[in-house]
């Protein structure tokens, strides 16, 4: 069938076209089927149908397909029915509880990266992986496929270190301290981090307050080789590109299949050339891993996958039932991290976790004797070497190396919530705390953050400040404070949670 091309400057994430329902019927295709669009070049695209947007005799072509085929408006193209990718049948195989082969897994991941699958097909794969879990072979094959379908970095010097946290704990700013400590010891650490999806700020969001974080894979290698480390946003690279597309499906479904968690983390680390890693697994109420028992099992799974990939993995089960440190979100978190590097001061939870994990990495990297890593980490901070290295990393990433903790901007709209009575703080809700921060504008508004004046187990008097919230916009601050009063993030003993009266 001959149709006239009509461009649409809309990104849809794949090759996609839209044709009139009458033309679709004549072609024998339905919405979700594929067609070949032929001009000087040929592409295969997913079909959408319409009764109104595109008139008969025309074909609407979205940006990705338009840029690939390079036709001009109203140019006549040939449109023919095309078969679905073979990977669709492999997805159906997983839905039927069958084990996939290495080749089948690679085909699925390749089609995800190339945009050859519809949202329905990708969702089917993610859901099937969640319901019918993958075995160790499938997880390894998925990891390798995610690496092969994106950019990879290799270094001439080894070991190449990395650190990753499963997440779920507000205030987990330790990457900003760990990366310069490890690099100051002479080890390489090309740290790629994520932005917050449901949290108040990921490591990349925090680092972006100090310097740019969006770099290509070759730039990451160059910066790491020059100063020993970097802390960048993984989403700006083409490293394991299938991961972001899978996450986009998982998020609205509120699922995180273990197989894809393992593959996602390990593919990104393997692709940047890391061969030695410490994995932080926070456990506790309102974290991703509620119990230590579940944490141990996840640790074993990661270590087994590391063995299969030739990576040395050690895991740290950490307490995640309460925020790390006293600063959560944006500039206040960055300030707290920098104060630790500047003065070796700060909340005990931040100091202890940073030093413990850094010590593990220094021992694994071979620069500290067994059981001496933590001592070396402390010396690197107290001597100023870690701070100097952090400034070098900031500079190589395009930031101001003269920045100090008191120069980091925070929101100028401020409110403090007071305790309604005397008593001990019994609980801090991680989820409510994060929700309040997001209502205040985090992670988009970099000035948003919370300072906790009291933590779990501490005594508070009536009228004392429980926490202070900073924001960039007054109306967002008001919305967040109102929410915190309706659903308190802190429970002080003796507080009435809800009053129920006779009507």
Swiss-Prot record:
Tell me the disulfide pairings in this chain: none
Task: Name the EC number(s).
Answer: 2.4.2.57
GO biological-process terms attached to the record = AMP catabolic process; pyrimidine deoxyribonucleoside metabolic process; pyrimidine nucleobase metabolic process
Q: Which GO terms describe its cellular component?
A: cytosol
Pfam families assigned: Glycos_trans_3N, Glycos_transf_3, PYNP_C
EC category name:
transferase
GO terms of molecular function: 1,4-alpha-oligoglucan phosphorylase activity; AMP binding; pentosyltransferase activity
Residues of the active site are 256
Has keyword Nucleotide-binding? no
Q: Which residues bind AMP?
A: 168, 194-199, 203, 264, 288
Reaction catalysed by this chain?
Answer: AMP + phosphate = alpha-D-ribose 1,5-bisphosphate + adenine; CMP + phosphate = cytosine + alpha-D-ribose 1,5-bisphosphate; UMP + phosphate = alpha-D-ribose 1,5-bisphosphate + uracil
- Keywords assigned: Glycosyltransferase, Transferase
Q: Which PANTHER family match?
A: THYMIDINE PHOSPHORYLASE (PTHR10515:SF0)
Q: Which NCBIfam families match?
A: AMP_phos, ARCH_P_rylase, PRK04350.1
- What job does the chain carry out? Catalyzes the conversion of AMP and phosphate to adenine and ribose 1,5-bisphosphate (R15P). Exhibits phosphorylase activity toward CMP and UMP in addition to AMP. Functions in an archaeal AMP degradation pathway, together with R15P isomerase and RubisCO.
State the family it belongs to: Belongs to the thymidine/pyrimidine-nucleoside phosphorylase family. Type 2 subfamily.
> Can you say what this protein is called?
AMP phosphorylase
């Amino acid at each position: 069938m001959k149709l006239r091309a009509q461009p649409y400057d809309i990104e849809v994430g794949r090759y996609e076209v839209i044709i009139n329902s009458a033309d679709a019927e004549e072609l024998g295709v339905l919405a979700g089927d594929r067609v070949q669009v032929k001009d000087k070049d040929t592409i295969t695209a997913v079909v959408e149908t319409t009764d109104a947007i595109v008139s008969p005799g025309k074909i609407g072509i979205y940006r990705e397909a338009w840029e690939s085929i390079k036709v001009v408006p109203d140019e006549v193209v040939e449109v023919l029915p095309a078969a679905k990718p073979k990977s669709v049948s492999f997805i159906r195989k997983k839905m039927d509880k069958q084990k996939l082969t290495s080749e089948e897994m690679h085909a699925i991941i390749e089609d995800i990266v190339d945009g050859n699958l519809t949202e329905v097909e990708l969702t089917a794969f993610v859901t099937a992986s969640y319901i019918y879990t993958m075995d160790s072979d499938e997880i390894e094959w998925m990891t390798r496929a995610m690496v092969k379908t994106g950019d990879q970095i290799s270094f001439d010097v080894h070991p190449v270190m990395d650190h990753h946290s499963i997440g779920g704990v507000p205030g987990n700013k330790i990457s900003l301290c760990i990366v310069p400590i490890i690099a100051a010891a002479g080890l390489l650490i090309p740290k790629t981090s994520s932005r917050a999806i449901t949290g108040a700020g990921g490591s990349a969001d925090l680092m972006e307050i100090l310097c740019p974080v969006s770099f290509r894979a070759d730039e990451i290698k160059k910066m790491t080789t020059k100063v020993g480390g970097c802390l960048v946003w993984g989403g700006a690279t083409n490293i394991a590109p299938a991961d972001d597309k899978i996450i986009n499906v998982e998020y609205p479904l509120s699922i995180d299949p273990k197989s894809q968690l393992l593959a996602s983390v390990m593919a990104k680390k393997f692709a940047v050339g890391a061969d030695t890693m410490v994995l932080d697994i926070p456990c506790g109420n309102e974290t991703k891993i509620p119990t230590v028992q579940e944490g141990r099992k996840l640790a074993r799974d990661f270590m087994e996958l590391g063995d299969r990939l030739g990576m040395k993995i050690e895991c740290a089960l950490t307490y995640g039932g309460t925020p790390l440190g006293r600063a959560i979100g944006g500039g206040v978190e960055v300030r707290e991290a920098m104060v630790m590097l500047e003065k070796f001061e700060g909340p005990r939870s931040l100091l202890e976790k940073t030093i413990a994990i850094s010590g593990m990495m220094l021992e694994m990297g071979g620069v500290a004797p067994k059981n001496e890593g933590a001592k070396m980490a402390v010396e690197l901070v107290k001597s100023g070497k870690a701070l100097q290295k952090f400034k070098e990393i900031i500079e190589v990433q395009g930031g101001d190396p003269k920045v100090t903790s008191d120069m980091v901007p925070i929101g100028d709209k401020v409110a403090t919530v007071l305790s309604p009575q005397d008593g001990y703080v019994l609980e801090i809700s991680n989820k409510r705390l994060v929700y309040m921060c997001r209502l205040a504008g985090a992670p988009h508004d970099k000035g948003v953050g919370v300072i906790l004046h009291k933590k779990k187990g501490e005594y508070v008097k009536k009228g004392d400040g429980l926490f202070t919230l900073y924001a960039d916009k007054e109306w967002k601050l008001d919305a967040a404070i109102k929410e915190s009063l309706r659903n308190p993030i802190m429970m002080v003993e003796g507080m009435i949670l809800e009053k129920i009266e006779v009507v």
